[in-house]
Each structure stands twice: as C-alpha cells, then as structure tokens.
C-alpha cells in the first residue's frame, strides 16, 4: 500500500468511524478574527486603498469561486473548510453590505497585526493605516454584538452555540519588522504579541463566547517571501526542508508562549473551552510529505503565482502584476504568492487540524461534513503527526 493511500485510510477511519461517546456539535455560527490567512473580503472593502490590494484582482480566486473575493489564495482558506466541516455556510466579511450574518461573521483583515500600530511604530516597525489590527476587529465585534443583543445575558444566549476562531494572527507583527530588525529584537517583543492575543481571547469570553480556537503561527521560515532574504542569515541556517531555522525557531518560541497563555486562560475561565490549533506542525508535515500528498516535489518552496529567483518570487513583481505567470495546476503547489498558500494546501492543513478540534470540543464526527471527499486534496493528514 502506497504512503498516500495509507494516509488517506488512517484519516478516513478517524473521521468517518465517529466518536461514539461524543456530543453532536450544536454550532449555529462562527466568528473569525485574524489576518490574511482568514480574511474573506474585508481588506478589499477598506478605503481608500483596499480595492487596489492584489487579492481584489485575478488570478486570486481562480480556483474558487472563479473570481476574486479578497481571499489571499487561488481559492478557499482554512476557515472555509472549517465552516463546511461544521455544515455551516462560508462566512461573509463584516464590511460586505447586504449579506446575511445569521451564521456568523468574518472580522479578519489581511495584513492585520496583533499589536496596535503605535506599539510597533515605537519600535521602528511601520504598518499601514489600512490594516485593521486585532483591537480594531474586536471593536467591530462589539458593534456587531450591540446590533443583535442588549444585555450580557441576552448576548451570552445569542452566542451559546457560537464557535470563535482567533487567528492565526501575529506573524505580520514579525513580518513587518523583518529584515529591518534582528531576530533578537523581534524575539524581545514576541511576549507582547502573545499577550495581545490572550487579552483578545479573554475579552471574547467576557462578551459571551464559550468555545474559542486559537491557532498558532505557521513555520515562517518556509515561505518564499522570507526565503528571499536568505542573504541576511548565516550559512548553514537552512534545515533539511530548505527552510530558515532561525525564523522557524522564532515561530516555535511564539507558539510555546501561546500555549502557556492559553493554559492560564483555561484556569481563569474553567467554563470555557479554549483550544490551541497546531498550525505549525500541520504545515511542517505538509512540507515534509508534500510529494506523497500530491504536491510537485520540485515546487514545495516555490510559488505557483510568481516570477524570478529560486523560489519563483520577486517582491517587486507580485502575483497579479502584468507579466507574472500562474502555474497551470495549483493543486501541485503549497505556496501561492510567496506569503500565502494554495487552496489545496489549506485543505490539507484543515484535514490535519479539524479532527483534533472536534475531539477537543467533545463533538461527534457523525455531524461533520466530509469535505475532504471533494476534489483535490483527498489524501489526508494524520491527526497530531509529529516529525
């Protein structure tokens, strides 16, 4: 039996056998906060420059739905697959007008940071005004909440069957600083980033949320945008996957603080279910096993949409720019544009993390839509696989 067939068999047993002692998930809505890995169309609606953002134009959205939506990919994101798995419609962005928010709202904004702009500016890190940071997204949520309930009790009742996803967020706080700040300088303010996310999680619970997923950040040393800065790192900094160890170690440090903060919150709010989603190891597993899962073995660190250099990435000629080509088959690529990933990659990461999330929420798999039966990405990733 081939490796990919074995992976698919193991995952199918996990998902479709069900957890007989679990409870049916009662979710009727999802609320998402985050950055470009979750934004389904907010940034492109933010004046004055949002409509000029690359994700507002083709080839973004070419795989799904066939036209740009503001998603930073050729198609769906992890949040889309989570919604589908829970039998809920895809989330509409908060800034989209004349749409239904009956089943939740997406407040995520591409480029958003966990820390406020003033904090980063004081440390010499410049962030555009257009990118709504985490506290601004929380303000949007408060405004929205005020439109559907008027008392704490009523709000708690409205949110009792809601799932909150906070992130991933925080990698932009690092990306905007790099390479103008050293790894040591960035590492020094990572605790402030994780504290900001923990405080946002605390606020969501105080406002009535009872089930919150907080994903860790991905291995930032594996994305083409950062690999393009290879000259800033000493020789030998690459690991066996070709990723930058210094940056990935920063992700590991970041995620360790995340998990510590969430453990403290679980003690502070014993009535809430707070889940850490291990995006880091999901992406590492995908990069390591990409060829067995359908990715082209020569393109694991290369962009599908891009041009130039060893990673098919040029920061001065972004995806969507005139003359920048797109690969003929995005399902064979993990990386989309140098910073973001393809729909096929997001699907596989979703397949990795969703079973663990559902188990932690004490839900039955029998209520989970088998999205992985559709289209590409049918090979599955084992739950909690470690290198």
Curated annotation (Swiss-Prot):
Keyword field: Alkaloid metabolism, Glycoprotein, Hydrolase, Signal
UniProt-listed InterPro entries: GDSL, SGNH_hydro_sf, SGNH_plant_lipase-like
Pfam families named in the record: Lipase_GDSL
EC number, as in UniProt: 3.1.1.80
Coiled coil: none
Glycosylation sites: 98, 180, 199, 249, 296
Catalysed reactions, semicolon-separated: 17-O-acetylajmaline + H2O = ajmaline + acetate + H(+); 17-O-acetylnorajmaline + H2O = norajmaline + acetate + H(+)
Biophysicochemical property: temperature dependence: Optimum temperature is 53 degrees Celsius.
Xref: Gene3D superfamilies: SGNH hydrolase
Pathway where it operates: Alkaloid biosynthesis; ajmaline biosynthesis
Protein name: Acetylajmalan esterase
Species of the source: Rauvolfia serpentina
């Amino acid at each position: 039996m081939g490796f990919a067939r074995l992976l698919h068999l193991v995952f199918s047993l996990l998902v479709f056998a069900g957890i007989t002692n679990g409870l049916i998930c009662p979710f009727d809505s999802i609320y998402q906060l985050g950055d470009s890995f979750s934004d389904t169309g907010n940034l492109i609606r933010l004046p004055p420059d949002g409509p000029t953002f690359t994700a507002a134009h083709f080839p973004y959205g070419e795989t799904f739905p066939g036209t740009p939506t503001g998603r930073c990919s050729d198609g769906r994101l992890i949040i889309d697959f989570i919604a589908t798995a829970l039998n809920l419609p895809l989330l509409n962005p908060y800034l989209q007008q004349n749409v239904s928010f009956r089943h939740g709202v997406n407040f995520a904004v591409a480029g958003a940071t966990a820390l406020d702009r003033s904090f980063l500016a004081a440390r010499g890190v410049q962030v555009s005004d257009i990118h709504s940071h985490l506290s601004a997204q929380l303000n949007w949520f408060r405004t929205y909440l005020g439109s559907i309930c008027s008392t704490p009790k009523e709000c708690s009742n409205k949110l009792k069957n809601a799932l909150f996803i906070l992130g991933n967020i925080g990698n932009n706080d690092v990306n905007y600083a790099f390479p103008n700040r050293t790894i040591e300088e960035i590492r020094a303010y990572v605790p402030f980033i994780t504290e900001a996310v923990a405080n946002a999680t605390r606020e969501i619970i105080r406002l009535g949320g009872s089930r919150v997923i907080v994903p860790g950040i991905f291995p930032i040393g594996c994305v083409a945008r950062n690999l393009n800065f290879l000259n800033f790192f000493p020789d030998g900094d690459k690991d066996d996957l070709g990723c930058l160890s210094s940056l990935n170690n920063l992700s590991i440090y970041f995620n360790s603080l995340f998990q510590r903060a969430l453990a403290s919150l679980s003690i502070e709010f014993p009535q809430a279910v707070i889940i850490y989603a291990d995006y880091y190891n999901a992406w590492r597993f995908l990069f390591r096993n990409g060829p067995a899962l359908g990715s082209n073995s020569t393109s694991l660190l290369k962009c599908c949409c891009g041009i130039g250099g060893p990673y098919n990435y040029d920061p001065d000629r972004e995806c969507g720019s005139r003359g920048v080509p797109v690969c003929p088959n995005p399902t064979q690529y993990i990386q989309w544009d140098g910073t973001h990933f393809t729909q096929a990659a997001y699907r596989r990461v979703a397949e990795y993390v969703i079973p663990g999330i559902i188990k932690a929420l004490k839900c039955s798999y029998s209520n989970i839509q088998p999205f992985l039966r559709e289209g590409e990405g049918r090979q599955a990733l084992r739950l909690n696989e470690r290198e």
